[in-house]
Each structure stands twice: as structure tokens, then as C-alpha cells.
Amino acid sequence: MAENTVKQGGIADRMPGPDPDEQARQSLERIKHKFIIMSGKGGVGKTSVSVNLALALANKGYQVGLMDVDLHGPDIPHMLGLSGMLTADDSKKMVPIPYSDHLKIISMESLMPNRDEAIIWRGPVKHAAIRQFIGDVTWGDLDFLIIDSPPGTGDEPLTVAQLIPDAKAVIVTTPQEVALADIRKSISFCRNVRMDIFGIIENMSGFNCPHCGKVVDLFGTGGGEKTAHNHGIPFLGKIAFDPEMVQCGDTGLAFQKKFTQSPITLAFQEIADKMAG
């Protein structure tokens, strides 16, 4: 692997060259819109939302980068059916893995020969890794950079806030109160670091029974919308729960490609329109 790419246990030694912060700044200048997808807790489907928002934007013809900064639990390549390892170009910059002509990916999963090996890093190393994901990657000109962050308000979202000051947050929650309590912490985090909150998405909001057609509120309903209203934050929409979404993620198939007219596909398209608006 190239000298300046991320390695297990730390960051590879760099040859004398451009300042890494300046490289990151130059890379970001070529990206129009940056969104970090956050959640207050795990298990709310945040990564699935990240993947599907990126796909919805790419399907509309935008050039999209999907950056996985969930360094300890990277899943995006698997969810998109991508199994290759990252390579480097002649300038020793990492080349994102292409999913399509309009979507490319970078993730720790694509840097690890043994994907069962744990990443054991402290904050400064995570900061350096994310900075490399921005500045040492041949992103080129992008309309959108979608950043999938781990749950909570730790090192990774803080690093994004520091390195990408114009990033906007999309906060994902489910309707139940335990998730809503944590989303309020995400709102507080964004306001403390002065990150704009673009909006809130209520995921897993209702399940249409395939037998009787009745909508079953597995996790309650309306909590995300109410929280958005109470905090003066735009509510971007509801995404229903569908077992097919889980199946597609497990097998690396694009749900939106397989179910083009699903209410879920249409909901992601509507949110993508708001992001592009």
C-alpha cells in the first residue's frame, strides 16, 4: 500500500510534502455540498440512510462521494457489494472505489486485508485518518460528499466539524423515546460546535404488513417530527421499515434499484431533492 495511506495501528510515515491541512482544504474546495449523517445512538439505520441518500443523489446524475468515517465499524462497501481494496495513483493518493459513474466510496473496510481485525485507535490517530480520507484521496470535483459518522458525539464527528466547517448535519433517529433522548444530545453537539443542522430523518417509521396491509408502528410514530418541531429544525421525512431493505444491505444489492417505485425509494428521492435544493 502507498506510503501515505492509513495503516492498522497508526498512520504511515509521510515523505516531506504539502501540509496535510492544506491538502484537505484544497480537496474540499472542489466539493460543493458536504453532509455528515449522524445519530445519537446505534441501531437506528444511520448507515443505511447514508448509503441510500448517496444512491438517490447519484441516481439524479450528481457526482457523489461517500466517505465512511465509522472507523471501528465500517460497513458501507459490504452494503454496496464492493469487495476490492483501495489502490493509490502515481502521486500516492488513494483512489476511491467506484460504485458507478456517479458514486465513489472510501472506507476503512477497503484498507483492511483482514476485515475481522479490530481497529484500536485513539483520537489523534482517528483525526489524522479522517484528514487523509479528505486530503489524500483523489475525490476530484464532487457535487456532494456524504459522510457516514459513527453513532454518538465522539472523535469522528468532532473531527469532521473541525476539518469541514461548512458540513451540514443530517440527524437520523427512530421514533421511540430512547432514541429521541440521544438525538437531543446530537442537536446539542451540533450547536456547541456551530455545525448547521440540515434536518432530521425519522427512520423505521412504521411497517406495512404484507398480509393485511395495516401499518404497524413498531417503534412508535412521530417522535422524530415532534423533536424537529420542538427544536426549530427542518423535518426531512419518514422512512418506513421494510425487511427487504435489510436483505439488500446484507447481500450488497441497491434497494432503490430493485424496488424503484417503493415508498422508501420515493422518500429518499424526496429528501435528496431537498439536499440539492
Language-model regions, residue ranges each:
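Extreme N-terminal, non-catalytic leader segments
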Residues: 1-41, 85
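Phosphate-binding/switch loop-helix module in NTP-utilizing enzymes
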Residues: 112-160
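C-terminal boundary of histidine-terminating zinc-finger modules
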Residues: 251-262
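Short glycine/serine/threonine-rich phosphate/pyrophosphate-binding segments
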Residues: 44-52, 73-77, 149-157, 179-182
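Phosphate-binding loop that captures ATP/GTP phosphates
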Residues: 63-65, 69-115, 120, 127, ...
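Conserved catalytic-core segment of NTP-binding enzymes
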Residues: 143-144, 150-248
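Glycine-rich phosphate-binding loops of nucleotide-dependent enzymes
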Residues: 106, 130, 149, 162, ...
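Walker A/P-loop phosphate-binding motif and the immediately C-terminal alpha-helix
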Residues: 34-70, 187
